């Protein structure tokens, strides 16, 4: 298996489908990287030469694409900033509620967690 930026990418898949194994690179970014590097997207990852791998790494670093740890750190710092300035989005993140204006009276179960029943008690005899 080829190793790029600390991530093992499968040898048997096409390089176009293997690059998205790296956190921060999707299908469209993968196509753009291969186009800039001048590599055929249909080549299997195991068939790539060392020069082609270094060309891919060079394109990713020169384009300023955030990947792996840098991207995770960036996302975390953005969330930390939102919560520290106490804006609406930060408050929603802190409370674990939907951030982008979705309704919460019904639905939003994924974000809110398991349903907690309140107020329904059986009568004592």
Curated annotation (Swiss-Prot):
One of its GO terms (biological process) is translation. Residues 92-125 are annotated as: Disordered. One of its GO terms (cellular component) is cytosol. InterPro entries: Rbsml_uS13_C (IPR027437), Ribosomal_uS13 (IPR001892), Ribosomal_uS13-like_H2TH (IPR010979), Ribosomal_uS13_bac-type (IPR019980), Ribosomal_uS13_CS (IPR018269). One of its GO terms (molecular function) is structural constituent of ribosome. PROSITE patterns: RIBOSOMAL_S13_1, RIBOSOMAL_S13_2. It comes from the Bacteria. The keyword RNA-binding applies. Keywords: Ribonucleoprotein, Ribosomal protein, RNA-binding, rRNA-binding, tRNA-binding. Belongs to the universal ribosomal protein uS13 family. Located at the top of the head of the 30S subunit, it contacts several helices of the 16S rRNA. In the 70S ribosome it contacts the 23S rRNA (bridge B1a) and protein L5 of the 50S subunit (bridge B1b), connecting the 2 subunits; these bridges are implicated in subunit movement. Contacts the tRNAs in the A and P-sites. Part of the 30S ribosomal subunit. Forms a loose heterodimer with protein S19. Forms two bridges to the 50S subunit in the 70S ribosome. This is Small ribosomal subunit protein uS13.
């Amino acid at each position: 298996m080829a190793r790029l930026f600390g991530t093992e990418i499968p040898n048997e898949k096409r390089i176009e489908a293997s690059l998205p194994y790296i956190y921060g690179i999707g299908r469209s970014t993968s196509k753009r990287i291969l186009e800039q590097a001048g590599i055929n997207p249909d080549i299997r990852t195991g068939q790539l030469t060392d020069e082609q791998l270094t060309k891919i790494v060079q394109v990713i670093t020169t384009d300023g694409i955030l990947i792996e740890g840098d991207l995770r750190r960036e996302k975390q710092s953005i969330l930390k900033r939102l919560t520290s300035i106490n804006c609406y989005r930060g408050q929603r993140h802190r409370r674990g509620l939907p951030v982008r204006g979705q309704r919460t009276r019904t639905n939003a179960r994924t974000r809110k967690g398991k349903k907690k029943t309140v107020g329904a008690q059986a009568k004592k005899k």
